[in-house]
Structure formats: structure tokens, C-alpha cells
Amino acid sequence: MAKKFELVSKYKPAGDQPKAIESLLDNLDAGLAHQVLLGVTGSGKTFTMANVIERSQRPTLILAHNKTLAAQLYGEMKEYFPNNAVEYFVSYYDYYQPEAYVPTTDTFIEKDASINDHIEQMRLSATKALMERRDVVLVASVSAIYGLGDPESYMKMMLHLRRGDIIDQRDVLRRLAQLQYKRNDAAFERGTYRVRGDVIDIFPAESEEIAVRLELFDSEVDRISFFEPLTGQITEKDVARATIYPKTHYVTPREVLVKAIEKIKDELKDRRDILLKQNKLIEEQRINQRTQFDIEMMLELGYCSGIENYSRYLSGRAPGEPPPTLMDYLPDNALLIIDESHVTVSQIGAMYKGDRSRKENLVEYGFRLPSALDNRPLKFDEFEAIAPQTLYVSATPGKYELERSGNEVVEQVVRPTGLIDPQIEVRPVATQVDDLMSEIRLRTEVGERVLATTLTKKMSEDLADYLDEHGIKVRYLHSDIDTVERMEIIRDLRLGKFDVLVGINLLREGLDMPEVSLVAILDADKEGFLRSDRSLIQTIGRAARNVNGRAILYADRITGSMQRAMDETDRRREKQIAYNKEHGITPQGLNKDITDVMDLGQGSAKARKSKAEKALAEVASGYDARTVVVKDAKAVMKEIDAKEKEMYKAAQNLEFEQAGKLRDEVAELREQLKRAV
């Protein structure tokens, strides 16, 4: 019997939530394809979403526009559904340099990437959950619209093991190799297996804590057990069956691979003829050499570097057809929730064009076959065509969502806690930094936190350095900081390890920090997408979860965007005040548990934390007591920054010996920094 969604919470729907939940469910039952939930900050939109999921009992994909928000939603959904499958699917690259060709300098840049092992495991776990069960909440970023292995091929490649099966040990090992598992009898880690006599231990690629032990008696499966890889302790003995999933989504059955290679050879021949007719001899030689090498690798190993560029043939799709994506793994009756839709929808539409322009260069100059253009994100119209029933969630819905839903908007403006939108003040730009510093001191004295947003990365770093020099515990947050570090920084702010977080565009949609009582928006009168009315409303909303919430806009004039943002905030304040008065509610601050949503091990967390704090030019353990050490560390950090800039410049100028020398000097300075700390 299929497991049902079971919402676990000490709270019951209140305020506008009960009415919103009923309206959304009625619309879903009526078959409405698109609807909008307009929910103000702090009104409990996530709780409403969780109630809709439980009441509808439908597998759900939640799309978020960045990894930070996705991680936060994942953590909240895990708390609401502890007995169900809550999964996380975002890009697994900590660093990614796609292959590219620059014709002006005749420079080919090889694909280079650093894969986050933990997130890769979570992606594999997500697709496994979609295939095995119905009670799945999957939180994803726009990675969901990028090409993924074909689900049919993926399912065909699974290795099913049953007690009593007759199977030769060599056949098991051969099948594991086809699934891209590696034999490692010394270090037993994810995606590997080891052999000890008639016992084969397999560490599934999608698993974090459980491995499979297969015991053979001659050619018969005698026993299957689950055990903890670290301790070797058996958790389940004598299991009837076990399924081993492939190590990657890009696995293909041998017969499909052989057919695909024949088609690749045909395309290669046609492409070579075209290039020769155009007298492009270098390009013809290049495409022949590169493609033949890939074909050899696929025949020998079953995969090659960049195998995704042949996904059209591997998935058996026609030219121009949409690639297989995570959306293809969803069950028929799935529900799609697009969180912060005013940003996420436009992001979905932008992915295809950027990818296309880069690949066209690679095709034109003989680095890839034209079929590589079909390894791409979904076009927006393709996404619309395969999207299931959709719920758009935002405090500031965009024009697209309103049009698609036929203005079917469910409002959730009243907060159950009685919290009122922040009061807004406008102050002059001339004294903004000093004024901000005095406001920060007032907040830190009573244990509250502050967010400050600037217009550029350089401004955020300079402001953080200036506040740090004046004894304020501060860090900054921007796009250079990877997914897990961002979540750790936000968690540390809530824990009080520092008091001020400076950012640019990341301190907006969805970030849930009830301890923040002041949002300071510097240069608020500079019109642009960072200071549009929607952006301002979202940023101001970060202080709406605190009973003392206030927002200060530093500006020399009130722009149209500022006025619209202030008018909308006042409208919401008035509605909440009237509701509180009618029901005798006294506003109460949120008391939300602080958890590490990613459930990461201490070792890796510490390593990342150390890296983040170096980038932020501070040492967490010595804000006050070790001032001298901090200054020494800061001096070393400045030297590291200077050397790194020289190193990157040398690499760009193709002076690799000089870059290598500078790299070694940077490594030595980092060792000095460790000793200083």
C-alpha cells in the first residue's frame, strides 16, 4: 500500500491560511491549470503549500530560483514531512566552466568542473524516490529544466538482486561496471564496490548511510543485507531483494549505445563532407579526431567525457525535440509549485538562449557535432507544454503569472502571528554609512540582527571591511560563495555568531531570518532591477518576521519604485492592523528553530566554514579577544588576494609558468594563515 503524506506540525492553519488552502484545493480539483498564491512575507506560504500537498496527496515538485532558497525550502519541508520522501535537486557543481571557443583569440577552453559529492548523491536519491514512491516532495532549482539522462534507459540499467537468484559473480561485477561503479577494496565509498571471497559489498551512489552486502553460495544469491559502511553494523538482515541504481543519470544499455554510435558516425560523415566543401580543413580534422575519440571511449567504457552532447541519439529523440529532464521523471498526477515566481519564471525563460549561443561557436569551429545543440535546457514553450498543474507563489506576482492564471489570485495577506509589515524611513545618502553604523549598535545591544544591501559586490566587500574595522561582527554574502556556505552563513547570523550580513541580490526572496529587525537599503534611489518596486518590497520583507521590524531606505529623492513599494507596504500594514484589532491579536515575533538543513558532516562543514571566513576577511573565533591575531590574518589575506589576482591575470595571458609560481606562493601564504590562527 502506498504511503500517504503526513504533515507534522504543532501549528494549525490561521489568519488567511485556512481560506487560502481551501481555495487552492478547490481550484486543483476543478482542474485549473494555473493559479497564483499572493502571500506576504511571514504569512506562512510554505505552511500553506505543505497543507495543500497533504490534502491533495500528490507528488510535488517545488521550483526555487536559487540554491539558497531551495535549501531553506528543503529544510522546512523535511520538518513538515519527516515520514515522507523530501528530496533536493540542484546543480551539483561547486565550480563549472563549460567548454567554449573564442574565435578572436583562437582559444578553446576545456570543460572544467568541481562536483559536490553530497549534492550529487541527493540528486540521485531524488530520481530514485520519484521512481519508487508517490509520497515525494522534490525541491529543485532551475537545474530541473536542464538535460538529464533518459528515464527509460536509466530504469533499464538498474540491477535487481533477489534472494535465491542464480547469477555468476563475474556477471554481477560486469553489471556493476556498466552502472559505472568502480571496484575499490581499500577505500569503500559512495559509487564503489569491494569483493571478499563470495561476498560483494556495494555502496549505492544515491545512498548516504546504507550499503548493500550480497553473499553468494556458488552461483546462487544466498543472502542480501543492508549495513552501515562506516561501522559495518548490519541494519537489516536477510532482505528479500535490493535494487542497485546507476552511479550517474547518463547510463545507456549496450544495445542502445551501439545503435547510437552508428548514428553518430553517420552524422560525423555528413558534417565532414560539409566542412570540406566549405574548405574548412582544420575544422574537419578537429571534429573527426574528437568524435572518433569519444566513440572509442563509449565502445570501451560505456561512457566518455561530455557524453551528454550525444544525448539526442542516446535517448532516441528526433532533431529539435526537447531533451529528457527531471520533468520526465515526474508521475502523471504531479503538482508543480513555482516559489517566488516573479523571479523563477523569467529565469526559466532565460536559460536556453545563453546555452545556445555558446554551443553554436563549438559546432561552427568543429569542436562538436550539430546534434550537441540538442543537449540543452528546455525552451520556455517546451516547459509550459510538459508542466503539470501549476501553483505560482509570490508576494509580488509578475505579469506572466497573472495572465496565465486568468487573474485567479488567492490572497494570503494576514499573518497568523499578527506581525505587521516594517515601518519605512527614508534618510539621506550623504551620511548613510555612519548612520547605518549607529543603527547597528542600537540593534546589537538588544541581540537583534541587521541586513544591509548594496548595489555591487565591491561595495558590499568595502562596507563589510569598514564595519569590521569598527568592531562590528559582519560578513557578506554574494554569488561567489557556494551553496552550502551560503546556508551556513545565514545559520550563523541567526545563531548570533555575527550581527550584520551585507549582500547585494541574495538578501531578498524567501530568506527566513526572524532575528533580523532592521533592513538597510543603501542607494535606494538608484533606479534599476535591484531597486525596482518588486525588489524593494522583497528586501523590506526580510524584516517582516520580527516584531520590531523596520526598514531604512537611504535616498536623496523618492523614486517611482520607492513610492510604489512604500504604498504597497502601507496597504498591507493597514490590513494587518485592522485584522489584529478585530481579533484582539498582539503581534508576536517568530520563534523558529535553527537547523542545519543540509545535514552535513562536521568535517566537511568545518572545511567549508574555514574557506568562507577567509573570503570574508575575518576569523570567527576572535572577534574581540584576539584582535592582534585578526589583524595579522587580515594582512596575510590581503596579500593572498593580491597574489591571486596576479595569478588569474597571468593565466589569462597564457603565462602558465608565472601563474604556477604564484599559485605555490598563495598555497604557502594559506599555510601561514593557518599557523597564525
Swiss-Prot record:
Top-level division of the source organism's lineage: Bacteria
For this protein, the record's SUPFAM superfamilies field holds:
C-terminal UvrC-binding domain of UvrB, P-loop containing nucleoside triphosphate hydrolases
Name the residues that bind ATP.
G39, V40, T41, G42, S43, G44, K45, T46
Classification via Gene3D superfamilies: P-loop containing nucleotide triphosphate hydrolases (3.40.50.300), UVR domain (4.10.860.10)
Localization terms from the record: Cytoplasm
Indicate which residues form the motif Beta-hairpin: 92-115
Residues annotated as domain Helicase C-terminal: 432-598
Print the keywords alphabetically.
ATP-binding, Cytoplasm, DNA damage, DNA excision, DNA repair, Excision nuclease, Nucleotide-binding, SOS response
The record's InterPro entries line, in alphabetical order, gives: Helicase/UvrB_N (IPR006935), Helicase_ATP-bd (IPR014001), Helicase_C-like (IPR001650), P-loop_NTPase (IPR027417), UVR_dom (IPR001943), UVR_dom_sf (IPR036876), UvrB (IPR004807), UvrB_inter (IPR041471)
UniProt keyword annotation of Nucleotide-binding present = yes
The record's principal subcellular location, in a coarse class, is cytoplasm
Q: Which GO terms describe its cellular component?
A: cytoplasm; excinuclease repair complex
The keyword Hydrolase belongs to this UniProt entry's keyword annotation: no
Q: What is the recorded function of this protein according to its Swiss-Prot or TrEMBL entry?
A: The UvrABC repair system catalyzes the recognition and processing of DNA lesions. A damage recognition complex composed of 2 UvrA and 2 UvrB subunits scans DNA for abnormalities. Upon binding of the UvrA(2)B(2) complex to a putative damaged site, the DNA wraps around one UvrB monomer. DNA wrap is dependent on ATP binding by UvrB and probably causes local melting of the DNA helix, facilitating insertion of UvrB beta-hairpin between the DNA strands. Then UvrB probes one DNA strand for the presence of a lesion.
Q: How does it assemble?
A: Forms a heterotetramer with UvrA during the search for lesions. Interacts with UvrC in an incision complex.
Domain remark text: The beta-hairpin motif is involved in DNA binding.
Can you tell me which family this protein belongs to?
Belongs to the UvrB family.
Q: What PANTHER family does the database record attribute to this sequence?
A: UVRABC SYSTEM PROTEIN B
Stated name of the protein: UvrABC system protein B
Q: What is the originating organism of this protein?
A: Idiomarina loihiensis (strain ATCC BAA-735 / DSM 15497 / L2-TR)
